[in-house]
Amino acid sequence: MAEGGVPLEKTAIGTYVPPAKPSLIGLSRAEMAERLAAIGIPREQRRMRVQQLWHWMYVRGARTFAEMTSVSKDMRAELEKHVTLDRPEVVAEQISSDGTRKWLLRLPSGDDLEKPHEVECVYIPETDRGTLCVSSQVGCTLNCSFCHTGTQRLVRNLTAGEIVGQIMVARDRLNDWADRETPHGNRLVTNIVMMGMGEPLYNFDAVRDGLLIVADNEGIGISKRRITLSTSGVVPNIVRAGEEIGVMLAISLHAVRDELRDELVPLNRKYPIAELMQACRDYPAASNAKRITFEYVMLKGVNDSLDDARRLVKLLNGIHAKINLIPFNPWPGTRYECSDWDQIEKFSEYVFNAGYSSPVRTPRGRDILAACGQLKSETEKLSARERQALRAMAMTD
């Protein structure tokens, strides 16, 4: 049981039921060696075989064992009998006018009678980087009032393999794997943000295990300084994340008064602002070079006054911090509006003059509901025929 009140491997709603023939994706080296032992690979070969598999899976992006030409034919046949390299299935892809891509990914439900479980993953290309926004849960339990994902019930946690699988799907779709022509070439996916569907720190073990695989420099190899974990404030797991994962930290703050944050981010009722700020001060990976990002969505007439800006500066005193100001991205049925641009600039200027970096995030992918706070698995509501139509669309891409 997580200290925040939600089990780490089993949610209050549903559980993950592994397939009869499991995927190797998401296993640590030790777990992969155990899997090889279970299918009869001799002890003296396991370390070498794990290294071979790791390279083919996470450097070359192999989708089948047949591609692994440095592995013996007999070994490939044995692997094919017992395990897979399956990643999430792309159900649909949308491409924004600004180049942002959103993938709807299908996951095993664990029950043939259930609708397939689906999450969304977003790729945001920029001139100097390519950022992938990754989900940690199917749905969300936090019910943040301004967030579209919060209107979808929590279904279950993702596994480490499903988290790593999102990065692999993105590299598949973008043709972003190393090959003979580009063994060390620039990659399109350079940064990872755990800012998709779900609260990462309510799925701590899977998020930790997945991100450590993503950061492994003998595989996918994305530096921990290019990976950001965003939390709404699961205080007991914040310091633990710094100790066991060591990536960059972002806090979904959005308010500087408990009474307002209780409404915007209901988790605040359990872990109020003072406790959250202390956890940030204690975060072991924070420094002037590795500042904590505080995300602050700009809501017209709600949290965007200069008094709010003054309180924010006072609140962050003594924390290595930067502030991301996020223009609110509307979604169907919301009661909030985005702050006027003039007010956003005044807020940003006040925070900047107080000594904090305060960039205003450029909205990306709004036209395909891929921007911050807009993600939701709309197919949770679709009929089987409609889901089949979406899958057919994806296969023709």
Swiss-Prot record:
Binding site for [4Fe-4S] cluster: 140, 144, 147
Disulfide bonds: 133-372
Keyword DNA-binding attributed: no
Subcellular localization: Cytoplasm
Catalytic activity: adenosine(2503) in 23S rRNA + 2 reduced [2Fe-2S]-[ferredoxin] + 2 S-adenosyl-L-methionine = 2-methyladenosine(2503) in 23S rRNA + 5'-deoxyadenosine + L-methionine + 2 oxidized [2Fe-2S]-[ferredoxin] + S-adenosyl-L-homocysteine; adenosine(37) in tRNA + 2 reduced [2Fe-2S]-[ferredoxin] + 2 S-adenosyl-L-methionine = 2-methyladenosine(37) in tRNA + 5'-deoxyadenosine + L-methionine + 2 oxidized [2Fe-2S]-[ferredoxin] + S-adenosyl-L-homocysteine
Radical SAM core domain boundaries: 126-369
HAMAP family reported for this sequence: RNA_methyltr_RlmN
Full protein name: Dual-specificity RNA methyltransferase RlmN
The species this protein was found in: Nitrobacter winogradskyi (strain ATCC 25391 / DSM 10237 / CIP 104748 / NCIMB 11846 / Nb-255)
